[in-house]
Amino acid sequence: MNNSVTRLLFKRLLTLQLCHHFDIIPHRDQSFDCVQMQQPQNETANNFIPSIQLLWSTDPPQIRPDGTYPQAVELFPCFKDKWNTKEEILNIILAANADPKSNCVTVQSSPRPCSSSQFIYPRLDNAWYKNDGYIWKKRTNGKQNREDHLNLKISGHPHISAKYIHSAIVPTFHRRSYSVPDSDCHVLVHYLNVKTNNKIDDQAEEIARSMIENKVFISLSQLHDQLSPIFLQTLNVNQLVAEINEHLKKKGVNLPTSPLPQEPSSSTSRELERRNSCSSAFRKGLSSVALRRQPSANSEIDANHIGTMLKRFGCNGSSSDRISIIQPTMQNFQSIRSHQNHVAMESRSPSGDGDSRPITFEEDASYQQLSIKSSTNVSTPASAFAEKMKIRSGSQESPMGPPSSSSVTSTSLIPIIEMTPSSSSLKGGQKMLVVGGYYRKGHEYKISFGRGRMMPAVLIHAGVLSCVIPPSAKPEVVQIRVFCNGQAISTASEFTYEPQSAHLIKENDDTLVQIFEKIRIMACAFNAYSSIENIQSSSCMESLLANIVQQIDNEVSSQNLNYKTELLNGSAHFPSKTVLHLVASLDYDRLFEALIDLSRKVPACREFDIFARDNDGSTPLHTACKNSASRIARLIISIDSSAIDVVDDRGRTPVEVAPEHSIDMLSDKNNEEERVNATELWVMTNGKAFTTDKILDGKISRAPIAEKPDDLLREATSSYSIMSEMYEGPMLQAGTSRECDEDCESCCDPDSTQQLHVEIAMDTDVHVPDSPKMARLFHAVTSPGIVVPPNARARMADLARQIIEALPDRIKRNSEVSMCPDEEDPGQNHHGGVEPMFYQQASCSMSTDSPNMMDDYFDMMATETRNDIFTEPRSTETTETSASKSAQLFATHCNFFDDRSFASSSTRANTFESDTLDFDKDLGEFFTIHVDRFVDPIQQRLANLKYNDDEQRDVYEAAMVIQRAYRVYRARSTTRRQEDIERRAALKIQGCYRRYKQFCYFKKLHNAAIVVQKHFRMRKRDDKEEGAVEAVIASVPEHPTLDGQSICIQVPKTNSTMLRERAATTIQVAYRYRHRKRQAAARKIQNFMRQNRNNVNIDDGHTQHLIAENACAKRRRYVACPQTSGDQRNKRDSDGERKRDAHHDAPEFIPIGATPSSTTIPHRPTQRHHPWDQLKPPYGCGTLA
């Protein structure tokens, strides 16, 4: 009684649960044999229990003691000519999960399964079953198969994950894979050709169209192998292939009759080319069997392998030999499956569809890779499950097919023959070479250093990989492996991270002690010594030192304390390493940031100056690059990008002192085509180096300690602004890069922007590259097909405005007269918004690249008067007053511009690049300068670069076109004709701008030569002890001498092999002669100028004159001053006696005929320090920056 009640309750509960979750309606063609089962004890992960039991044709429907099954038993059909319903799919997968030992579960994949066949595969560790030998549609990148992912819902809940893939040859042939996400143990795979068109001609035309669209061009034999399993029972495959070939020939595609070499059945020839270069590695989405070959080896493919295999079990493709497959009969299916399992080769391959989980190192170590060495056309998929069991059992045999099939041998992974170096320090950064069986390029190689450290590798030679050794946190021995396209292809090799040597540890400890001492001195200078009390130098770490600096910063901010400058600036005569140098050597980025934050409250402090130099002339960036401190290097470059162009005493930039491949951003900077040359940098800055006023902003430049007179400050700012504009390189910002506007994103991308190469006709062999900002601007306004963003238009209009203001008035008047003919058409008076200056005669001279620019622009604008919102009345004044009217008209239109875009000519900060050129001064000089061609070679080059009147008129007209375009672009949509005219005008302005930059270059070169010559004369005067001052000056040669020969600054003529760098090198050699170290020379010049600052009396018999050295104007002059007695000077100076003693130490400045005891020392009228006194070595005049 109890047993019957229990069985009845179980039936009702099971029925209610199945009906609640999904309504199971058995189809008419399904047969269910009901047997009495035990009550299930376990349920699946999604609380479902299978409603059927899957049995193979040879399995009797009996109860197994090791499994729990429902009450229904179903024979799993291997072939089904329609898609399964969602309920059927769920039942099949759950039944397979409940009984994984069932014979319905297949552990071997079949090559090119026939249409209507379905399989149940175990997932194992990857989607290995997807390598079935068919050619499927690819993604847009052409590398991976395209899969459509869907979630099938049952009763409103997504319980089935489906993946659909479509054939690239037969558009009606598909493969569908189903799995249950909550219980991802088995997968149901179904192949089906949903449309069977019996007309061969229509089917052939459809297949030919699909092959052309998917770019599948294979041989006729391979096409026959692809179509045979799909149209096994419906069409004559031989006739179908012939029809397809005819359709392809009509469309201009000829398929090869012989099989393409090195082409497996599961991929095209292009895929195999990429595939074979991996040696024994397999690429995602390609065949599971790796083709291992040497560079000189060629593998041929047997095109008839599949045909031979099909003939063995009766599938030869002919209509007379077709096999009639009957659905209830299972013996034929079993024989086909057994034969497929027999000929399948063992291998393991991950799926290339992107849905497989990554392979761990342990799994890769437990598997081996098979390769084909003989001539085989088909890389048949293999049984991953059987291979896994075989390899774990230690067996080395591979089940083979008939002797006529391919010969397959099992080999291990590619061994690493040698690697150098085999050990490294904890810092890493060295280049390592790995030698092995890696031959061809075009693949993504990576080398793993233990777990979680993958470094990209480059194939620099056949069999040689190169990568950078990553840093390590502790000394250890790690396993190194080579990966190709994400798959391990080599055996493991040991690599050792060695601990630091004793002397390196000692050096680091000494550096830490020095940093602590520096911070202690800083605390004393800021009267914040309480922050470092009870702290020992032996316990200093980066975090502790950073906290100390932050405490000092907080105390300075809260109390606003005065600090002692002498403790922070150190000695100017003996430059040493600053705290930034020491921190950069250890790569303490947190401490470096804390010091930079503190420097914002301490202006003009050498300890916090990123341009400060040590005794070798190295900046903190040099030190960071030498020690591979990448974090500090990125931080310094983000603060001020010009630090990468500073050179040390040996003329080396930070890029040149950095180890190879240690810092990527510096290597990229070094590999640029247009890079700063150390000699050119020194010449362009007149031997000066400048730091920044606001370190974190890095925008406003200033001289180091430039005080009055204002001329020196103006000259220094102008010189540095030229350098910052001309040589500002694209740095690699670490998370601080400035984003462009949405409209300008495409044209302002530093990765996609390239410099425009527009030929400029000029008589010079000097090329000054565009800065990145100007290159991006010109690229945005001159490239066809790119929408010009508003900010680029504003900047271009600003440049055009400055050019117009710099041009002489006579050029403007002549251009206005030429653009305003006397006899005008009365109908043209009503062209709204077109100024008189835009009219142009046909005889107006225009450049060859912009003919009739103004006429085209006027015609174009006249047709768009309806959209023009700028209506200006026609000028009725005479041609004599046209200049004033034009200025008024220009000022009227300038009111429309934004305040940020336009400013007065005297406001430099509001220009489109605040740190670029001094356009107001230099452009006017460029257009109006009068040079003598017979003075010297540099003057000749300046004369050649100067624009003549006709060229200046062309530039003026182009600038007016840009001005007009900017005023009206917001109110109308630009046309193609308008864009062409604006582009030609922008090219004209670009040529003018580039020639102007070359003009500035030669001008600075000339000024640098003058500076060197003047300094040489100063030194020559000090060495002369006899003769009057006039005689001394007269005796100084015009040019410095080297080895008894006069050195003259010369620039080669056109077509000469000597370039500008040799001229600058000549300047350096002349200046640095007889001085090994630059600091010593700078100190001597400073002492000389400091001593000559005091006035010296010279008695010429009548009056007394004073000779004063004016370092700013770089010239000597005589200044008459009233005679002052020594007693009066002593009364005004309480410390006169000490000053007289100090001046007696410089006998070379005592006039001839006077004695030290009788010479009266002049009094310094003011306490204002001369600007040269504040220049620290190597910032002296004429030093090499």
Swiss-Prot record:
Compartments reported by the entry: Nucleus
Bias type Low complexity, positions: 393-411
Transcription regulation as UniProt keyword: yes
UniProt DNA-binding residue ranges: 72-200
PROSITE patterns in the cross-refs: ANK_REP_REGION (PS50297), CG_1 (PS51437), IQ (PS50096)
Gene Ontology molecular function terms on file: chromatin binding; double-stranded DNA binding; transcription coregulator activity
Any one Gene Ontology BP term: positive chemotaxis
Residue ranges annotated for the IPT/TIG domain, each copy included: 418-498
Annotated ranges, domain IQ: 957-984
Signal peptide from the UniProt entry: none
Pfam families linked to this entry: CG-1
Functional description taken from the UniProt entry: Transcription factor. Positively modulates neuronal levels of the ubiquitous Ca2+ sensor calmodulin/cmd-1, probably by direct binding to the cmd-1 promoter, thereby regulating Ca2+ signaling, physiology, and behavior.
Family recorded in the similarity comment: Belongs to the CAMTA family.
Domain notes: May negatively modulate calmodulin/cmd-1 expression via a negative feedback loop in which the IQ domains bind to calmodulin.
Protein name per UniProt: Calmodulin-binding transcription activator homolog 1
